[in-house]
Amino acid sequence: MNRKFIITMLALCLVFVSHAQEHKIEHNFNLGVGVASLAKNDVHYSFRIGYGLNYYLAENWSVMPGVSYRAVFEDPFKGDVVGVESDDCSFIDVPVLLQYHQHARGEKGFVAELGPVFSFLTSNSTYYTDANPQDELNDKKMYKNFDFGIQPGVYYQTGKHWRFGVQAHIGFCNMLKKYPSINDSKRLNDVAATVNFSF
């Protein structure tokens, strides 16, 4: 009984060791700044910072779950406009990305990624009508708590650790909360220039 148990455990250890040698895990940190299609007549900016754990399925393919903080905000140098509310917001994103690596590990080449992203609202904006302080929308939250979308990206890897490219967020959900006087819809999208450090 003990011999069978030991042999079974040794066999499992050998499988895990060989599996670990065939597949590589890679840590990724990314930082991005870009623009977002949040306002009708005004450009908004986006900022993101995140971490991903990249698991290589094969030489050119990997899957990378991760977590990141993403903020969408107005031009910080514009100043407040009387009678116009701020519509800034931020999210914790949880993407699960499939990546294709054109090159061998640690070499120069392109990387393309695509996958679903689950977004959880961390800061909201509220409505405010300066011309009518009694408006029923005043102080009510604008956005829903959850969004679902996809996250495409393309990068150029310069060597063993650094990748530079473009990453986007495409939201599928109408993020505006339902109120009797609100008939609009708003999907949150952004594109960001991104730098990625991996090891």
Language-model segments: residues:
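Bacterial Sec-dependent N-terminal signal peptides
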Residues: 1-30, 195-199
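Transmembrane beta-barrel outer-membrane domains
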Residues: 22-24, 40-46, 85-93, 141-147, ...
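Predominantly the C-terminal beta-signal and adjacent terminal strand-loop region
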Residues: 64-77, 89, 141, 150-199
